[in-house]
Amino acid sequence: MLRNTFFRNTSRRFLATVKQPSIGRYTGKPNPSTGKYTVSFIEGDGIGPEISKSVKKIFSAANVPIEWESCDVSPIFVNGLTTIPDPAVQSITKNLVALKGPLATPIGKGHRSLNLTLRKTFGLFANVRPAKSIEGFKTTYENVDLVLIRENTEGEYSGIEHIVCPGVVQSIKLITRDASERVIRYAFEYARAIGRPRVIVVHKSTIQRLADGLFVNVAKELSKEYPDLTLETELIDNSVLKVVTNPSAYTDAVSVCPNLYGDILSDLNSGLSAGSLGLTPSANIGHKISIFEAVHGSAPDIAGQDKANPTALLLSSVMMLNHMGLTNHADQIQNAVLSTIASGPENRTGDLAGTATTSSFTEAVIKRL
């Protein structure tokens, strides 16, 4: 009885999108001969192959109708810039969806973030970061339930910077109406889909009057198309103060913000909800293509030691399954993962003050499917 109650309470916990937002919907079809969907899998670097193996084992045990297509995004140089290899681009473009482990950006002149390169290549304009407390895993804050949507393609991450003269560097924050409208409209649609009545635009237009001012003004214009939702605006510094003092004030809202603010706030939210990025899923949404990823790093210091926590990638795969409409399989895996974590330190990895290995955690999840 207790187990069933836990399952009901955690159902569709991280990405409640049984009703899909009207933007960025998955349109892929299963293979007629196998009845399975093909998903590109970027295993990543460092601990990536280990946590990817965990996902594959659990999906196999759960009989999820998915065939994995391995995808190598090791960067190549074209005209001096980091580029994704053509086979990887073709795979993801064909399959419309990918699951991605952590990537390490090579060190050296000309290399830019591989995550940024993927977002640019596939037009992944919205980064969806849910953060919610896990029942049975005690952290400083309880009952955290936050959803943040980050603009994913421009802002301070546009890569436009140069040396003006020795000792002076200029970095450009690029904000455009098109990109702002894209992500804000998605935030409205997402809020409507998951039943949250408020959309909060986080900004600093008191200082960045033109850049953030444009972002806020676009939101105000779009809000007229969503009379059933309430638009609020909030200064970034005030938002940080409020969320750490009273995160429950945001349980009925979806926050949306420009790129840099979203990068910082999303990790803050993860700290409030779980105390670890090892539990945090993420979705990168484009109009046609979406990539789901663990947001933590590649952790080369523990790679190959059977110590890595696969939870973030597993919960990202749950987000992916919901996105694809495979909600029963999503619920099955999600509930198994969360009940495993709640069962005690013997089934938690070291980053959660537990004693489990990657392998033993994986087997514990499979037993709970």
Swiss-Prot record:
UniProt entry tagged with the keyword Cytoplasm: no
Entry cofactors: Mg(2+); Mn(2+)
Name recorded for this polypeptide: Isocitrate dehydrogenase [NAD] subunit 2, mitochondrial
Entry keyword set: Allosteric enzyme, Magnesium, Manganese, Metal-binding, Mitochondrion, NAD, Oxidoreductase, Phosphoprotein, RNA-binding, Transit peptide, Tricarboxylic acid cycle
Further remark: Present with 43100 molecules/cell in log phase SD medium.
Domain of life: Eukaryota
Organism for this UniProt entry: Saccharomyces cerevisiae (strain ATCC 204508 / S288c)
Residues that, per the record, bind Mg(2+): D237, D263, D267
Family to which the UniProt record says this protein belongs: Belongs to the isocitrate and isopropylmalate dehydrogenases family.
Modified residues (Phosphothreonine): T105, T153, T327, T349
Lineage: Eukaryota, Fungi, Dikarya, Ascomycota, Saccharomycotina
One of the record's GO molecular function terms: isocitrate dehydrogenase (NAD+) activity
GO cellular component terms, semicolon-separated: isocitrate dehydrogenase complex (NAD+); mitochondrial matrix; mitochondrion
Function field: Performs an essential role in the oxidative function of the citric acid cycle. Also binds RNA; specifically to the 5'-untranslated leaders of mitochondrial mRNAs.
Gene3D superfamilies: Isopropylmalate Dehydrogenase
Catalytic activity: D-threo-isocitrate + NAD(+) = 2-oxoglutarate + CO2 + NADH
